[in-house]
Design a protein with these regions (language model features):
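Sec-dependent N-terminal signal peptides of Gram-positive bacterial secreted proteins and lipoproteins
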Residues: 1-22
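Ser/Thr/Gly/Pro-rich low-complexity, disordered linker/stalk segments of secreted
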Residues: 22-69, 377
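Compact, charge-rich alpha-helical regulatory domains located at protein termini
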Residues: 406-434
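Extracellular glycan-binding segments that recognize GlcNAc-based cell-wall polysaccharides
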Residues: 52-408, 419-422
Length: 434
């Protein structure tokens, strides 16, 4: 059908165009009366044409509304030359006036997750090396008016040398170190900084993914995230749970491979509550399940890598600040569960992606924008000129083609290249042509 239509369009373009005005013009020897009548007729014709044109515009707008208007999606991306720079760029945008900052070793993802218990969207997370601050982080700190700097982890994570330099360079800032004997103890220590909490969230301490997208749920429920091991709850975790007077809701984020049934039973026995588990078949579907629980009709979503933790972890404090869910994506593939969620959730009009092209490719990013805009990515794309020609061949053109009307699509220049496909059919991967 598509090839036939394209061929017919090319054939039409080879025919000479007949001007209706030339065909209907009066003979040179016509009388003045005929000319006057012709002028009156022309005026009426112009008025009718204008009215018809206005009606067609209104009708087209109504039709477009019925079929689904393409939304003007607000989209932005935060990235940097390295993970430290990405974190700084996020801080400058969302936490420009902060007076507190949390420093995390750039290779210690468990400490970064624990940092969210203290941040809760109020303070930024910046990266440091074990023995020295990066140039990017040092420059960012120099521009802030800080009264407190948190260090996540012990001296084996952020050395005493770094701490001493911070005390020297920022004499008016209080330096507070949050640490434990291991990642689970550090998690429990960070949870102690939360007050009036009646909800608890548990996630695996052996991978960053589940705990990362759980941060938006933690902000929604005003709950700390406690990292756990499948070997059982640590003593510090048990003590923290027992220190809470009244517990309302208890949630495990992640499947049984991440947090097994035995640990779930321990949590239920300690909290005296039935535990809710949020999980999907993989981390991508799990992030969708959590997103649905955070907000059924979100205005904004955050996407970040489900494969590389460095850039992704910076998104946690942003998600808490703007109350937006985090969706995990692959580098150059938009997983089916995430794609369907974006397509079906009509409330979304803003997309924030955190991470560079090495973690989320340009094609993947543009696919997300297109899906959120409301475009049916399974159909070929027509420009406005192509629409007029297609209508001559089929009245049901909207069943087969998409007619974009916003800034994301360039007009098609040649009719023999009328059909531009946005789908690159590789398993679950949809990538628009650049």
């Amino acid at each position: 059908m598509k090839k036939l239509v394209a061929l017919m369009l090319v054939c039409m373009l080879s025919f000479p165009v007949v001007s209706i005005a030339d065909k209907d013009s009066p003979n040179e020897g016509a009388s003045e009366k005929v000319e006057a009548n012709a002028n009156d007729t022309a005026k009426k014709s112009d008025a009718n044409a204008k009215a018809k044109d206005e009606n067609e515009k209104k009708q087209e707008q109504i039709t477009t509304n019925e079929d689904g208007v393409f939304k003007n999606v607000i989209h932005q991306r935060f990235q940097g030359e390295n993970r430290a720079k990405t974190a700084v760029n996020v801080q400058r945008h969302y936490f420009a006036n902060t007076n507190k900052v949390i420093l995390v070793n750039d290779n210690a993802y468990p400490d970064a997750i624990s940092a969210t218990n203290m941040s809760m969207g109020k303070y930024p997370l910046l990266y440091t090396g074990k023995n020295s601050l990066s140039v990017e982080t040092k420059s960012a700190l120099d521009k802030m008016f800080l009264d407190e700097i948190y260090l996540m982890g012990g001296v084996n994570t952020i050395s005493k040398n770094v701490e001493n330099k911070l005390r020297k360079n920022f004499p008016h800032a209080k330096i507070t170190r949050i640490m434990g004997n291991n990642r689970y103890d550090t998690s429990a220590e960070s949870a102690k900084t939360r007050s009036n909490t009646t909800n608890l969230i548990f996630a695996a301490g052996t991978n960053y993914a589940d705990a990362l997208y759980a941060t938006s749920l933690a902000a929604h429920q005003n709950a700390p995230i406690l990292l756990v091991s499948n070997e059982g709850l640590s003593q510090s975790t048990r003590k923290f749970i027992q220190s809470i007077g009244n517990i309302d809701n208890v949630t495990i984020v992640g499947g049984e491979i991440s947090v097994n049934q035995s640990v779930k039973n321990q949590i239920e026995n300690l909290t005296k509550k039935r535990v809710t588990r949020l999980a999907g078949v993989d981390r991508y579907e799990s992030s969708v399940e959590v997103a649905k629980r955070v907000n059924a009709n979100p205005a904004e979503v955050i996407t970040t890598s489900g494969e590389v933790f460095a850039d992704a972890l910076v998104s946690s404090t942003v998600a808490q600040k703007i109350k937006a869910p985090i969706l995990l994506v692959k580098k150059d593939v938009l997983p089916l569960s995430v794609r369907e969620y974006m397509k079906d959730t009509n409330s979304i009009y803003k997309l924030t992606t955190i991470g560079g092209y090495n973690t989320v490719t340009k094609n993947n990013y543009s696919t997300q924008v297109i899906l959120i805009s409301g475009l049916d990515i399974d159909k070929p794309l027509l420009d406005k000129q192509g629409k007029g020609l297609i209508k001559a061949f089929t009245k049901d053109y909207k069943k087969y083609y998409v007619l974009p009307n916003n800034k994301y699509y360039n007009s098609i220049k040649e009719y023999d290249k009328l059909f531009v496909y946005l789908r690159d059919a590789l398993a679950e991967d949809y990538r628009p042509l650049e």
